Structure formats: structure tokens, C-alpha cells
């Protein structure tokens, strides 16, 4: 696949992976599902779910290091700024041969356009929060998050390559 194909797939993921409702219990259940999926894949990642700026779920798996929390924060900031997945923003920048700082004036100290953060979209409303993971290569982070989210919502979506 090329970047254009991946961006189309990402747009479909963002449009399809929407919630009819989202609350504290949803965050707990989804965070637990992500933890289980990471354990099955033998990954050491950190998982964060925020709703309207409030952290509802956070878990750092054994084997993670403190800097992973900063990666989670920086990826989350990208989703909060653009209401798009961090991986999609990274691919768009790659396609334009640009960076967050060059194009938008966003410092790499606070923003990271690497895969692993995804908007929580509420049907009829839009982005109300973020789901962020970090600890694996960016495509692996993105695909784990999206496949778990799709399963959680009872949907089937192809992975991005």
C-alpha cells in the first residue's frame, strides 16, 4: 500500500469507529480490553484513555519505562489538536515532506505524530476524548489500538499497512 491508500483506510477507521455513548465504565472496559490484547501479543505498552481532558484509565505494563508516559502525552496532544489519529497526521506530514513544527508551529516537545493515539468519536457529536498507547513501533501501536477498538465495538476493519 502507498500513503494515499493508507490515508483512505485511516479516514474510514476514524469515520467507522464511533461510539453511541462513552462514560467511565466504557473507558474501564476498553482499557482492560487493550491491556488484554497487549498481553496476548506479549507487548509492553502504556495505555491512557481521556474523556474531555480527564484521565479515566491509565495502565503502564511491566517492562515499560517512564518516558513512555511522555510519548502517550505527546500523541494524545496531536489527537486533541486535530481530532484525527496521530498516525494519520504523521502520514499526512510525511506525504507533504513536513513536520508538525514546520507546518503548524507545534513543538516536538509536546506533540508527536507517531501512531498510537486515536479520537473517541461520539456519534452525532465528534471527538470527545482520546485513546492513546505507546511502547511498540508506531504501526504496531496503531493497529493494536484500532483492531481492539473495532472488536470492542463489534466491527470489522482492515488494518493499515
From Swiss-Prot:
Belongs to the UPF0303 family. HAMAP family: UPF0303 (MF_00761). InterPro entries: PduO/GlcC-like (IPR005624), PduO/GlcC-like_sf (IPR038084), YBR137W-like (IPR010371). This is UPF0303 protein Spro_1996. It holds the Pfam family HbpS-like. It comes from Serratia proteamaculans (strain 568). The lineage of its organism: Bacteria, Pseudomonadati, Pseudomonadota, Gammaproteobacteria, Enterobacterales.
